[in-house]
From Swiss-Prot:
<keyword id="KW-1003">Cell membrane</keyword>
<dbReference type="InterPro" id="IPR036127">
    <property type="entry name" value="CcmE-like_sf"/>
</dbReference>
<feature type="binding site" description="axial binding residue">
    <location>
        <position position="127"/>
    </location>
    <ligand>
        <name>heme</name>
    </ligand>
</feature>
<dbReference type="GO" id="GO:0020037">
    <property type="term" value="F:heme binding"/>
</dbReference>
<keyword id="KW-0479">Metal-binding</keyword>
<feature type="topological domain" description="Cytoplasmic">
    <location>
        <begin position="1"/>
        <end position="7"/>
    </location>
</feature>
<keyword id="KW-0997">Cell inner membrane</keyword>
<comment type="function">
    <text>Heme chaperone required for the biogenesis of c-type cytochromes. Transiently binds heme delivered by CcmC and transfers the heme to apo-cytochromes in a process facilitated by CcmF and CcmH.</text>
</comment>
<comment type="similarity">
    <text>Belongs to the CcmE/CycJ family.</text>
</comment>
<dbReference type="InterPro" id="IPR004329">
    <property type="entry name" value="CcmE"/>
</dbReference>
<keyword id="KW-0735">Signal-anchor</keyword>
<keyword id="KW-0349">Heme</keyword>
<keyword id="KW-0201">Cytochrome c-type biogenesis</keyword>
<feature type="binding site" description="covalent">
    <location>
        <position position="123"/>
    </location>
    <ligand>
        <name>heme</name>
    </ligand>
</feature>
<dbReference type="GO" id="GO:0005886">
    <property type="term" value="C:plasma membrane"/>
</dbReference>
<dbReference type="InterPro" id="IPR012340">
    <property type="entry name" value="NA-bd_OB-fold"/>
</dbReference>
<keyword id="KW-0472">Membrane</keyword>
Length: 159
């Protein structure tokens, strides 16, 4: 083998190793990437059905139900436009309450219930995860638009 062929072989081997390393890093990154979705996005089927994701919003008032085993809790997460039922088995954070912000990590089952593997509550009364705050603002804007359209329709029918 000539020196030129050896250099070319070394270069190709180095490129192959770099490509394999890049593929492994991207695969690890992809498997650890968890997206955030609001209840409205989940209801619109924008959330992945087979992958883990985060669901954020408010715990709907009157929705917390504890099952007989003492560890399983069912509740509803809402963004004031849509609601998603959640089931969680484990200890809830001390700050978990109705009407307060929550972010849960888990998957959707076939019935549309979010099966949470982790539940996080906001840490004080002023904090809301940025994604959840944005989702709530968007839902409130949609609700206002719908209310104004309904009011316009009622005014037109009264004429």
């Amino acid at each position: 083998m000539t020196p030129r062929q050896r250099r070319l072989g070394m270069l190709l081997a180095a490129l192959a190793c770099a490509g394999i390393a890049l593929a492994l890093v991207l695969n690890a990154f992809r498997s650890n990437l968890v997206f955030f979705f609001s209840p409205s996005q989940v209801a619109a089927h924008e959330a992945p059905a087979s992958r883990s994701f985060r669901l954020g919003g408010l715990v709907a008032p009157g929705s917390i139900r504890r099952e007989g085993d003492g560890m399983t809790v069912r509740f509803i997460v809402t963004d004031k436009a849509r609601e998603v039922p959640v089931v969680y088995r484990g200890l809830l954070p001390d700050l978990f309450r109705e009407g307060k912000g929550v972010v849960a990590r888990g998957t959707l089952d076939r019935s549309g219930t979010f099966v949470a593997s982790e539940v996080l509550a906001k840490h004080d009364e002023n904090y809301m995860p940025p994604e959840a705050a944005d989702a709530l603002k968007q839902a409130e804007q949609v609700n206002r638009r719908m209310a104004s359209q309904l009011a316009e329709g009622e005014r037109e029918t009264q004429r």
